[in-house]
Amino acid sequence: MKKDNPLKTKTAKKIIKEIELQVSENSTLYVEYSNWYCGITNKPNVRKSGHKSKNNKEPAFWKSFNARSVKISLSIETHFHNKGMLDTDDKGGYDKDKSKFIYVYKKHPTILD
């Protein structure tokens, strides 16, 4: 039996489209995925505060989405990491049972942003 591809779900397709739009609308001249960070969490507001503290500034163009499952959120995260979005080196910093939210923000905004 063939395994289902989480990226084929309506939820994943919708979130991918929304993230692409978010990135496109908040990129100067062209999309540079390496200027963006993508991650998953079970508490978007707590995670946003963590990034704010770590980077000493508000995450630019922050947006989070409810992927409805960890499997879907991980698949979307991997999809965008493969496109060049930034990630941390330590995979596994998420709650394997509850991290159904995916979030993105512009890690390296330009002076024109």
Model regions and ranges:
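GIY-YIG nuclease catalytic motif and its immediate N-terminal context
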Residues: 1-113
